[in-house]
């Protein structure tokens, strides 16, 4: 094989590897952002219910705790809003 063909094949392989790495990072960040939006939405709903009725929904709090993987305790005090 000619050296130019070898260089072209090597460059193509490197480009494919870089593309796979970049798209993997993009996918991981997309999942992280999507998860954070869910958490933000749940926090907003809990705040609205706390303002309206004086207490928050236990079901939403459990769902939020599953998303943040902290058990049943959120890292902030929701009651003092």
Swiss-Prot record:
The keyword Membrane applies. It comes from the Viruses. It is a single-pass type I membrane protein. Residues 50-81 are annotated as: Disordered. Pfam families: Vpu. Residues 62-81 have a biased composition (Basic and acidic residues). The chain crosses the membrane at residues 8-28. Residues 1-7 are extracellular. GO terms for cellular component: host cell membrane; membrane. It is found in: Host membrane. One of its GO terms (biological process) is symbiont-mediated suppression of host type I interferon-mediated signaling pathway. GO terms for molecular function: CD4 receptor binding; monoatomic cation channel activity. Phosphorylated by host CK2. This phosphorylation is necessary for interaction with human BTRC and degradation of CD4. SUPFAM superfamilies: HIV-1 VPU cytoplasmic domain (SSF57647). Gene3D superfamilies: HIV-1 VPU cytoplasmic domain. Residues 29-81 are cytoplasmic. The keyword Cell membrane does not apply. Ion channel activity is inhibited by hexamethylene amiloride in vitro. Keywords: AIDS, Apoptosis, Host membrane, Host-virus interaction, Inhibition of host innate immune response by virus, Inhibition of host tetherin by virus, Ion channel, Ion transport, Membrane, Phosphoprotein, Transmembrane, Transmembrane helix, Transport, Viral immunoevasion. The modification Phosphoserine is found at residues 53, 57. The N-terminus and transmembrane domains are required for self-oligomerization and proper virion budding, whereas the cytoplasmic domain is required for CD4 degradation. The cytoplasmic domain is composed of 2 amphipathic alpha helix that form a U-shape. HIV-1 lineages are divided in three main groups, M (for Major), O (for Outlier), and N (for New, or Non-M, Non-O). The vast majority of strains found worldwide belong to the group M. Group O seems to be endemic to and largely confined to Cameroon and neighboring countries in West Central Africa, where these viruses represent a small minority of HIV-1 strains. The group N is represented by a limited number of isolates from Cameroonian persons. The group M is further subdivided in 9 clades or subtypes (A to D, F to H, J and K). Homopentamer. Interacts with host CD4 and BRTC; these interactions induce proteasomal degradation of CD4. Interacts with host BST2; this interaction leads to the degradation of host BST2. Interacts with host FBXW11. Interacts with host AP1M1; this interaction plays a role in the mistrafficking and subsequent degradation of host BST2. Interacts with host RANBP2; this interaction allows Vpu to down-regulate host BLM sumoylation. Belongs to the HIV-1 VPU protein family. Enhances virion budding by targeting host CD4 and Tetherin/BST2 to proteasome degradation. Degradation of CD4 prevents any unwanted premature interactions between viral Env and its host receptor CD4 in the endoplasmic reticulum. Degradation of antiretroviral protein Tetherin/BST2 is important for virion budding, as BST2 tethers new viral particles to the host cell membrane. Mechanistically, Vpu bridges either CD4 or BST2 to BTRC, a substrate recognition subunit of the Skp1/Cullin/F-box protein E3 ubiquitin ligase, induces their ubiquitination and subsequent proteasomal degradation. This is Protein Vpu. It comes from Human immunodeficiency virus type 1 group M subtype D (isolate NDK).
């Amino acid at each position: 094989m000619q050296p130019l063909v070898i260089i072209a094949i090597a460059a193509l392989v490197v480009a494919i590897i870089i593309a796979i790495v970049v798209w993997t990072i993009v996918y991981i960040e997309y999942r992280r952002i999507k998860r954070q939006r869910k958490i933000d939405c749940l926090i907003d709903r809990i705040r609205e219910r706390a303002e309206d009725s004086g207490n928050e929904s236990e079901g939403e709090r459990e769902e939020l705790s599953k998303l943040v993987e902290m058990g049943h305790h959120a890292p902030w005090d929701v009651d003092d809003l």
